[in-house]
Amino acid sequence: MTIKNVLKLAALLGVLALVQAEEQTYRMCVPQKYYEDCLNLLKDPSEAGIRMECVAGRDRIDCLDKINQRKADVLASEPEDMYVAYHTKNSDYKVISEIRTQEDKDAAFRYEGIILVKKNSNIHSLKELRGAKSCHTGFGRNVGFKIPVTKLKNAHILKVSMDPELTATERELKALSEFFSESCLVGTYSPYPETDRLLKKKYPNLCALCEKPEQCNYPDKFSGYDGAIRCLDKGKGEVAFTKVQFIKKYFGMVPGVTAEGDPSEFEYLCEDGSRRPLNGPACSWAQRPWTGYISNVDAVSGDEKLHNLQHRLEKFFENGLHAENKEAASHLLINPNAVYHSKPQAVDPKEYLEKAGYKDVIERDGSAIRKMKMCVQTDVEMQKCDTMRRAAYSREIRPEIECVQEKDCILAVKDNKADMVAVPAQNYKEARDGKLKPIVYESYGPNNVYVAVVDSALTKENLQSMPIHYNGQDHRAEKAAAYLNKLRGINTCQTTPSSEKNIMIVNAQQLEQYKNKQLLCSSLDKKPVTEWQSCNLEANLPVGVFIRETMTPVEQETMKHLFVSLSDKFGSKGKLPDVFTLFGQYKDNVHNVLFADDAVEFVTELKNPNTNEQTYNGLKCDTNTIKKN
């Protein structure tokens, strides 16, 4: 073969490789709950010819695992998801592009946290912030709380007590209260109203600069990004913690915005103690990176592969902006104000986060006492616990969870080898005998209770002895039937499903089809089907999280807060159920791992009068317990 022919062949192979790359179908992983949205978006006429396909993951954590296992190519992810990717063993993730906003499409970061002081201020270093009057966006928020606490702690300027008698939250509040003379730090310090009230009463100087110190919550004209600046400009503050974009808006440094203050009277305070004018580049001490797309090395190795995937994503993204189904697009992080931005090179998640100084913010310990050990028994429980641990830590839920696997978890908690265990109804008594106590329970939602449906014509005498129709495979329905039998003086151990449908045990969620019937209450009186809340026979105990009775009050409060936080973030009603599926099916063909699939949240007390340990124990006819592996 001549050199000329070799060159022709090489050129032809190059063209074929390019065509093959162009024709490759890329697999975008999306959480299961948004899978239909992804399919609908790809059906949109605007997406015609875009070679993308949707792959369903249980949640974002599962999608990351699928990318690592080469079962998917790309995922739209937030910085916290990138943190999970960075800490995944044997992984080679790459951040390849960003989702920016129209207003800040040229900005390297989504936002920059800064320190703002008055030009005539005597504060010229981080140390000199001690004793100052501080203005914050709000409790628990990034630039106004987490970043200042993290940075000042890391600089060994803010001293946080490790007093075991204080909760992690109170330790930080106490530290800020002692560091600043007065502040405006609005927000909910605790999910429990009484605890929130007591904390604000104990540290009143944290609310002293607010518009309404006695309320110390939203709305307040000195809260939020612009409110923190206003607290410094119009209030009594001496330093504000906010972000650059709102500095520009507040001082009228963006077109079409009326200034609220004079920018020449204020300066940025830098970490090294220097100052910068507001009309120049800011010196931020931490930034939040952009949301973006994450892939793996195989999909983006070499410029050609990288650019091809980026080009395909850009077309998908641009078309998504013009899609008819805007809601479906938004679930895939394609919002009307968004702009797609390709990275010049694929970047490791660790490098991406460290460049912004955001890794430290995620890793802030929250002044937690220690890691809390959750005991599990089976391999699949261990897998779910570890997934929960990864998701929780990345979303700054503290204390950190550590998963341990034991044959007998109740004994492990009793013997101090673990701190907590999820206990099903049939093992409450064993847990109580082991000196354990519940701190939270799973809840199935307000109308997910079992009721007895009857004909309105049936007399009380009829109802006293008629057999009960129910699903014998449904443990909750079985307990409701047993409870009704006990109320009627019938031996609960002889409860079996009947084919007769005079009395039917059904879930209140199905009552629409029984609206011509009535409910039979625990008093054996009848009520309309609309009265299911007070007239139900729910007697099964939900899964409870048990801890040692001997744990200190602070430890107990910390554990309770941990699970309430998990529920608030990842429960069915939570803010981020697509990040981690706390409740719901964890794996194909595997149900009720640690918690029930149909649970929706954790609650701290059982409010249904029928649902209590005494009633449940009175219905027992067997010795079913957790099997010891």
Curated annotation (Swiss-Prot):
GO molecular function annotations of the record: metal ion binding
Cysteine-cysteine disulfides: C29-C63, C38-C54, C135-C231, C184-C210, C207-C216, C270-C283, C375-C409, C385-C403
PROSITE patterns named in the record: TRANSFERRIN_LIKE_2, TRANSFERRIN_LIKE_4
Residue positions binding Fe(3+): Y111, Y225, D408, H561
GO cellular component: early endosome; extracellular space; plasma membrane; recycling endosome
GO BP field: iron ion transport
Keyword flag Transcription regulation: no
Superkingdom, natural source: Eukaryota
Signal sequence, start to end: 1-21
Keyword Phosphoprotein set for record: no
This protein's UniProt keywords: Disulfide bond, Ion transport, Iron, Iron transport, Metal-binding, Repeat, Signal, Transport
CDD domains in alphabetical order: PBP2_transferrin
Any single Pfam family the record assigns to this protein: Transferrin
Domain Transferrin-like: 26-366, 372-621
Protein task: Transferrins are iron binding transport proteins which bind Fe(3+) ion in association with the binding of an anion, usually bicarbonate. This transferrin binds only one Fe(3+) ion per protein molecule. Transports iron ions from the hemolymph into the eggs during the vitellogenic stage (oogenesis).
Family: Belongs to the transferrin family.
Quaternary assembly: Monomer.
Name of this protein: Transferrin
Species: Sarcophaga peregrina
